[in-house]
Amino acid sequence: MRLTKMRFPARRMALAAATLGLVVAGSGFTAQAAEAPSSTPVPINPPDGTVMSYVVNAAQANPGQTRKVELAVTASGGVVVQSWPAIGVVIAQSDRAAFRENVKTVGKTSILSVGATRTAEVGDKITGVQLPWGPGASGWNKGKNKPVNGDEPTTLVPAGPADSQESQQWDMAQINADKAHAITDGSRSVLVGVLDSGIDPTHVDLAANISVADSVNCTQGGRPSQAAGGWYPTTSDHGTHVAGTIAGVRNGVGIVGVAPNVRMASVKVVNDDGYIYPEYAICGFMWAGQRGMDVTNNSYYIDPFEFWCDDQPDQAAVRDAVSRAVNYSVSKGVVSAAAAGNSGVDFNTNTTDSASPNDAPAPIQRTINAGCKDIPTQLPGVVTVSSITQAGQLSSFSNRGLGHIDVAAPGSRILSTTLNGKYGLKSGTSMASPHVAGVLALMKSAHPELTPAQMVAKLRADATKTPCSAAQNNSGATCDGTTELNSYYGYGVVDALKAVK
């Protein structure tokens, strides 16, 4: 991941077809103009004996075609780690150098595309036999707290004895969450999936709002596991901080979240090395759809590429697989908020990527084009969130781009929950996105009849229209657009009060 860059390592809400038994070549990408430069290739050519992870995408998303893909994987020297027949995606591992070519030959017309999900050898190797489409085993290990994906390290804040720190939460006032709470704190029927590094289940400001029954670990090869403790945080407080912003409990202690009475599921998609690989995110979105979640928060980009390019076969196959999972979740009623990212670039003008692949000994300087996207934030079906400061300026680190940013939210020096019952300040678009997830949760609480498309339309319409101004420290590309829609704030700053009316 680089959590936005959460090490952890953040489009439009063009809703996916509600019917997933479709020919999924339709989740394809826009062709590049003839004069557009090709993106820099990143060859992934492991020698025999190197275990790699792959997505294998069926030409049609149905159980019969997916079963053909599974058989092709096995016949080609691969192991089926996880099957998602609802979207026609199989996660496989293989130590055969020619696996991609062989599986396409064996699978024939049943397979649309195959792509490696990483450039490095798999650490989470799957060797056991898995029941078809069922969860596997997993575990977790204690580790040191790691910073994520461009987000600043946590600055711990002393907590007073049973004191509320609401007065320090300027961010809640900025989005009118405090006023919204006079109408509702949210409904217990609303469930938010926090796709992240795990949520501390012992924190006094979180424990009451965590749904253990809906929490899961997706970091064992992309296979969902509800083994005890698997979804706990291990090497990062990132998910715990995000969770507090979404739904910190109102209890007179510490902080209060945007939607303090909704429930959250910890959907762990960040491994102990700080990576969110595609198969983990696919598992997270599929789990959210299958468990009937209403909202997900995604404060990360999917590793190992900050931008995934549709003119590179491996990257294109991965984008297709992740897109299918996002589309599936939308078809099941899920609205997903995502961090725009912390590289300070304008999506419309950026032509280089020097951070990828981040699982290699060293990243390379890549040329990218308009067909290269930051995922999941730039995928259809995802609400993209930029970050602003307490003064209302675009945060210096925030990505931007006219037609790419949906809304803006506070993301600089945000006070929230951290590990071991503590509180801390973090900055990043990772901190902005959970404000929007919380607002969406409040909206769903007040208006349970709304569909995902209607929720996104209302979120945009309700946002406080904000004209262009200088970014923090005058950093990065200047603002482009109108008061109604621009590259910094999108449709405006999210408004919790209007969301519940």
Residue ranges and their predicted role:
Residues 1-35:
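Secretory targeting and sorting signals
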Residues 24-47, 252:
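C-terminal region of N-terminal signal peptides and the immediate post-cleavage residues
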Residues 36, 42-43, 60-63, 67-166:
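Autoinhibitory propeptides
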Residues 40-47, 81, 293-300, 447-501:
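C-terminal subdomain of the subtilisin-like protease fold in secreted/lumenal serine endopeptidases
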Residues 140-143, 147-263, 283, 289-318, ...:
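Active-site core segment of subtilase-fold serine proteases
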Residues 187, 269-376, 419-434, 485-486:
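Substrate-binding/access-modulating region of protease and related hydrolase catalytic domains
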Residues 188-191, 195, 224-268, 277, ...:
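Active-site alpha-helical elements of protease catalytic centers
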Residues 334, 359-445, 449, 457, ...:
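Extracellular S/T/G-rich loop segment that most often corresponds to the catalytic His/Ser-adjacent loop
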